[in-house]
């Protein structure tokens, strides 16, 4: 085909599909006795892309990894937390198996199993959810429960969560309905007391009520392309019963609630226990014994707990686990910085005692794995600032004294006589 504006007779030409003249479009492409404009070509491409999108979910469903494969993939990125990995692997496998079989098996309707993750800050809750979404190649979005309020109040509406998920997959509803939503800080929306209050709690119990139907499964009406709702608007209809919701929170103080329950009824007189079981147990051991009644006492309403039937607890990371996190996962922090330095043609080495010092510092901060990056970033900041302006640096070495703030990283130059310390 050739680009033509007029035929040999100089007659004005029109697109054979939309009827626009050659003056109304940028290009008019001619074939044997037919013309098509650039706008119609774009429209045809859009139609083909939409058909490809509709076919792709069926292809994805045929390759569902087994629980063992899911667990092994999580092992590549998340250190420790073995019980939580096992619970997540089974729950995620069952969820997507339910979707693949159309929510029923031999006429039996299969229930939805959303997940509640309980564990201290920096224990890997968010990373587990992100890694699962990457493995399954499904849309993933995160929401902060502390920003949510009931509809009609100042704050973020719970349906905005679905809007964010749609944005991640270019507003493809079918793809969004197979996605994963992670709601963080879910413990922060617990009601303020055990007893229901006559005053409205729009950011606590009110949000729990608003999330109920969304998590259980409803048809959410979402404005297309993120616009505001108005009566004459056409909405995108999203079935949330097919979306996997994972809620996570630190639940600070929940271990004490569990401890009180365990110690209740320990007896008096000859039947008394001198020291309660909970006083000897660690926080992680207590959290692993969590029951729905403990969560209710903490401030979650029974209906909300019922929508999160799968509960996985994560323990606080030990010093050894933090050292492993620094060097073993596929995207380990030390590997990330080594890759960053290699872009400058420089080798970065972390001595073993330096890794131990970083882990000890993170333990003291009580921020778990989340605090590791800020520590490493802090000790390497000056080096990363100066390195692009320096010549002949071949290697940077970080030892224990660097982490302690007693010296700067050692710089090793290409010429032996130019070896110097960055002090």
Curated annotation (Swiss-Prot):
Entry's Gene Ontology BP terms: cell division; proteolysis involved in protein catabolic process
InterPro entries: AAA+_ATPase, ATP-dep_Clp_protease_ClpX, ATPase_AAA_core, Clp_ATPase_C, Clp_protease_ATP-bd_su_ClpX, ClpX_bact, P-loop_NTPase, Znf_CppX_C4
Keywords, ordered alphabetically: ATP-binding, Chaperone, Metal-binding, Nucleotide-binding, Zinc
Binding site for Zn(2+): 15, 18, 37, 40
SMART domains named among the record's database cross-references: AAA, ClpB_D2-small, zf-C4_ClpX
Function description: ATP-dependent specificity component of the Clp protease. It directs the protease to specific substrates. Can perform chaperone functions in the absence of ClpP.
Self-association state and partner proteins as the record states: Component of the ClpX-ClpP complex. Forms a hexameric ring that, in the presence of ATP, binds to fourteen ClpP subunits assembled into a disk-like structure with a central cavity, resembling the structure of eukaryotic proteasomes.
Full protein name: ATP-dependent Clp protease ATP-binding subunit ClpX
Species of provenance: Yersinia pseudotuberculosis serotype I (strain IP32953)
Classification of source organism: Bacteria, Pseudomonadati, Pseudomonadota, Gammaproteobacteria, Enterobacterales
């Amino acid at each position: 085909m050739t680009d033509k504006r007029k035929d040999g007779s100089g007659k004005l030409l029109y697109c054979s599909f939309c009827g626009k003249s050659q003056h109304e479009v940028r290009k008019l492409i001619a074939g044997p006795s037919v013309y098509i404009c650039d706008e119609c070509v774009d429209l045809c491409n859009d139609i083909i892309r939409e058909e490809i999108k509709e076919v792709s979910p069926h292809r994805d469903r045929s390759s569902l990894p087994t629980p063992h494969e899911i667990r092994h993939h999580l092992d590549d990125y998340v250190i420790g937390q073995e019980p939580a990995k096992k619970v997540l692997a089974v729950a995620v496998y069952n969820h997507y198996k339910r979707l693949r079989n159309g929510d029923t098996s031999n006429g039996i309707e299969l229930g939805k199993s959303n997940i509640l993750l309980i564990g201290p800050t920096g224990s890997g809750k968010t990373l587990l959810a992100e890694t699962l979404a990457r493995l399954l190649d499904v849309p993933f979005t995160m929401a902060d429960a502390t920003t949510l309020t009931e509809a009609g109040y100042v704050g973020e509406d719970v349906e905005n969560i679905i809007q964010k998920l749609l944005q991640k997959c270019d507003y493809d509803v079918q793809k969004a309905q197979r996605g994963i939503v992670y709601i963080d800080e879910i413990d922060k929306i617990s009601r303020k007391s055990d007893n229901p209050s006559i005053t409205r709690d729009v950011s606590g119990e009110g949000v729990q009520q608003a999330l109920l139907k969304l998590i259980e499964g409803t048809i959410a009406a979402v404005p297309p392309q993120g616009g505001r709702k108005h009566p004459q608007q056409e909405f995108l209809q999203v079935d949330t019963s097919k979306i996997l919701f994972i809620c996570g929170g630190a639940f600070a103080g929940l271990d004490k609630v569990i401890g009180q329950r365990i110690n209740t009824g320990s007896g008096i007189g000859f039947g008394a226990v001198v020291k309660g079981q909970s006083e000897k147990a660690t926080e992680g051991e207590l959290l692993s014994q969590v029951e729905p009644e403990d969560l209710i006492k903490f401030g979650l309403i029974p209906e909300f707990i019922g929508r999160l039937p799968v509960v996985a607890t994560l323990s606080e990371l030990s010093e050894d686990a933090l050292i492993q996190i620094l060097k073993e996962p596929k995207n380990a922090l030390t590997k990330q910085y080594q890759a960053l330095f290699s872009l400058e043609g420089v080798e970065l080495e972390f001595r073993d005692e330096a890794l131990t010092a970083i882990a000890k510092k993170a333990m003291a901060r009580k921020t778990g794995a989340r605090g590791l990056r800020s520590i490493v970033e802090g000790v390497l900041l000056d080096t990363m600032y100066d390195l692009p302006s320096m010549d002949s640096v071949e290697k940077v070495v970080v030892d224990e004294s660097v982490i302690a703030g007693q010296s700067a990283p050692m710089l090793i130059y290409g010429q032996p006589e130019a070896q110097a310390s960055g002090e």
